Design a protein with these regions (language model features):
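Outer-membrane beta-barrel translocator/receptor signature
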Residues: 128-131, 142-219, 225-229, 276, ...
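Acidic/polar loop-and-plug regions of large Gram-negative outer-membrane beta-barrel proteins
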Residues: 201, 205, 215-285, 298-331, ...
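Conserved C-terminal beta-signal and adjacent last beta-strands/turns
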Residues: 353, 475, 510, 596-695
């Protein structure tokens, strides 16, 4: 595949602005995209993530949680992990390199989407161009293909909307947080709407030596080419340069008893992510009942890092061992999707049918360097004292190439879905998808190569019953597949004659629940009960540890309850509680009977907001997380915690000023972990002040 060069100017401005202003003289009907009415209501009443059609949430036979990012940014939240904190049975990881999330006990770090397009590269995502985040829980292969064992995370971006106001936002706070962002909108003609989100953020951290800088440039255009044809084009450039932070180690089964500001990296460490995406969506109304859509997504990531991180605690010397890695990573993903959606009736039955064709092409080129010792047999990277680390002790030897791979992935899929309305009480959702997936990895160091071809058929079935006007009961069953090489995009080429089983892993879910509206439809709740099984989990052959078999079993069972909406008057609520048991049931690597790492048995959140249309307003909330294990062998425990946050503000027609206080009780807690040596402390008490001017 030829090299593809994407730059902010050439793609962002030339595609959007030049096209828009070149057609400024054309007068056609107004774009159909319009602004949301009630911005204070935390509910999202309609979603396309679950069905890829505009479907009311209450008629989706699967749990789905939506979070509006505006309320989160007031607390200084600008990353995905923090944004999803408190969602029932969702936990965020602590990998400093990229976003890491577990949904219902299963890793979803490669199940991220942007406006329904796969975005699975390894980086930390910016939320300033995002309207809301939707978490679809359970297998989603019918519409999204591979992965998604516990669910998917879809970011819904800010769209150009006719008549939308512009705004400028400035923010400052603890640890030298300072940022300025602009959200600018204009309608050069009746049929063209433009929007530009851009900004810059700088911050230090309560963690010694940690800092970061974010940059964002995201123009978009909606162009009503004809009364029946709309073209939406979106571009985003994001850069995040930061200090990699691997937290603190575990000691004697608990996080080390050191200051939460203690760090063990090298002063020269850095991570520099530069991401670009270009998305195009053409929507053609064939008639009143049928629509044809074509969506193209191009994603490019350039990521470099130099990271010295802790690997273990040594009690005999009261020291922390370390290793150093460098990486140059480039990824290029191209996805093309064509869908036909329409409605019709047969024998009194109403159908909403969706058919689709999806083509994907992905390239990944990681080159990894490892530290070597200055003297033969010596220690490559100096260890540091646990309590008083001297980060000036650096690795001074050379870096040697330890891995240099090139991976190509080609995916093809067709799918069909029918939302069938039997009568006023009963609805059926049925879908089927067929995927072909091919991954080819070349090891440039060893001059070896291996390709794996796999295919899978993924079904989905749901039943919705509405015996009462405000209460909908549902039951669903779904299945997904995870092919070899479909996670981090790549496989490890083996020697000729390898007998590893590289067939896809398979996951199935059973879920029942009830979705209700209360208080004259002001408050919405969802109660869900589920069982999720990865029933051919990869594990080692007990007779030969070098051979991989598909004989393991991982299971998650749980209950979730969410509530969002308006209680009375100007009082709003959002929150939920999750209970789950996520364990490895069968395994040959010593994990059998162990809880899945970094997954709590229970978590909850509750935020109550008082927000009149104008004047003073306030919000307060609690986030509760139970204890978790830092590792798969369950040797180090992260204690459960509760965090109390609050916010107060004052708004008029054009101005909105608010101040947020995070972790009011200044409680020491541990947010997550990636291993026994890498546990991330939670943020201490901090303040964030935000001012927004709208015009």
């Amino acid at each position: 595949m030829p090299a593809l060069r994407l730059t902010p100017i050439t793609l962002g401005l030339s595609v959007l602005l030049s096209v828009g202003f070149a057609c400024a003289a054309t007068t056609l009907p107004e774009t159909s995209i319009s602004a949301e009415v009630d911005e204070d209501d935390p509910r999202v009443k309609e979603t396309s993530t679950a069905t890829r059609t505009a479907t009311p949430v209450r008629y989706v036979p699967q749990a789905i949680d939506s979070v509006k990012t505006e309320s989160l940014r007031s607390y200084g939240t600008n990353d995905l992990g923090q944004a999803l904190s408190g969602i029932p049975n969702v936990s965020s990881g602590a990998d400093t390199r990229f976003d890491s999330v577990r949904i219902r006990g299963f890793d979803a770090s490669n199940d991220f989407y942007l406006d329904g397009i796969r975005d699975d590269s390894q980086y930390v995502r910016d939320l300033h161009n995002i309207e809301r985040i939707e978490v679809l829980k359970g297998p989603a292969a019918v519409l999204y293909g591979r992965g998604g064992q516990g669910g998917i995370v879809n970011r819904v971006s800010k769209l150009p909307m006719a008549g939308h106001k512009s705004s400028i936002e400035a923010q400052g706070g603890s640890d030298d947080l300072r940022s300025v962002y602009a959200d600018l909108s204009t309608d050069p003609t009746d049929n063209i709407s433009l929007r530009l989100n851009m900004g810059n953020q700088d911050n230090n951290s309560f963690r010694d030596g940690v800092s970061g800088n974010r940059q964002l440039f995201a123009p978009s255009m909606s162009w009503q080419l004809t009364p029946d044809l709309n073209w939406l084009v979106q571009y985003e450039y994001s850069r995040y340069n930061r200090t990699p932070d691997r937290g603190i180690p575990g000691v004697n089964g608990r996080p080390a008893d050191v200051s939460r500001s203690t760090t063990y990296f090298d002063n020269r460490d850095y991570i520099d992510d530069k991401t670009q995406s270009l998305r195009s969506k053409l929507a053609y109304e064939l008639n009143d009942n049928w629509q044809l859509r074509q969506t193209l997504g191009v994603f490019k990531l350039d990521s470099d890092f130099d990271n010295t991180y802790q690997t273990a605690y040594v009690p005999a010397t009261h020291s922390v061992t370390r290793q150093r890695w460098q990486q140059d990573l480039t990824t290029l993903n191209v996805f093309n999707n064509v869908e036909l959606e329409g409605g019709f009736s047969t024998y009194g039955l109403e159908h909403r049918v969706l058919t689709g064709l999806e083509l994907g092409s992905q390239r990944r080129d990681p080159k990894l360097y490892t530290a070597t010792a200055v003297n033969r047999g010596g220690q490559a990277v100096p260890s540091l004292d646990l309590s008083q680390p001297n980060r000036n002790l650096s690795h001074t030897g050379r870096m040697s190439v330890s891995s240099n791979n090139h991976t190509e992935v080609e995916s093809r899929a067709i799918y069909v879905q029918d939302q069938l309305r039997l009568n006023d009480q009963w609805q059926v959702l049925a879908g089927l998808r067929y995927d072909r997936f091919e991954v080819d990895t070349q090891n440039k160091l060893l001059n070896t190569q291996q390709d794996v071809k796999s295919h899978s058929t993924s079904p989905r079935f749901g039943l919705v019953w509405t015996p009462l006007e405000h209460h909908t009961f549902y039951a669903s069953w779904s299945k997904t597949f995870s092919p070899a090489g479909g996670g981090l995009i790549g496989i490890t080429p083996n020697a000729a004659g390898s007998v590893n089983d590289l067939s896809p892993e398979l996951t199935k879910q059973k879920e029942i629940g009830v979705k209700s509206d209360w208080l004259d439809d002001r408050l919405s709740t969802t109660l869900a009960v589920y069982e999720l099984e990865l029933y051919n989990r990869r594990t080692s052959d007990p007779l030969d540890r070098t051979i991989t078999l598909l004989s393991g079993l991982q299971r998650s069972r749980g209950v979730e309850l969410t509530a969002t909406g308006k209680i009375v008057g100007n009082w709003y609520v959002r929150g939920g509680v999750g209970l789950q048991e996520a364990t490895v049931e069968k395994d040959n690597n010593g994990f059998e009977g162990k809880r899945v790492s970094d997954v709590a048995k229970r978590n909850a959140s509750l935020f109550i907001t008082w927000k009149p249309e104008m004047g003073w307003y306030a919000e307060t909330g609690l986030t509760l997380v139970g204890d978790r294990y830092a590792d798969s062998l369950n040797t180090v425990v992260l204690p459960g915690y509760g965090r109390w946050d609050a916010l107060a503000g004052f708004r008029q027609k054009e101005w909105d000023v608010r101040a947020a206080l995070n972790n009011i009780a200044d409680k020491t807690y541990y947010a997550s972990a990636t291993s026994v040596a890498q546990i991330q402390p939670g943020e201490p008490r901090s303040v964030v002040v935000t001012g927004t001017y709208s015009f």
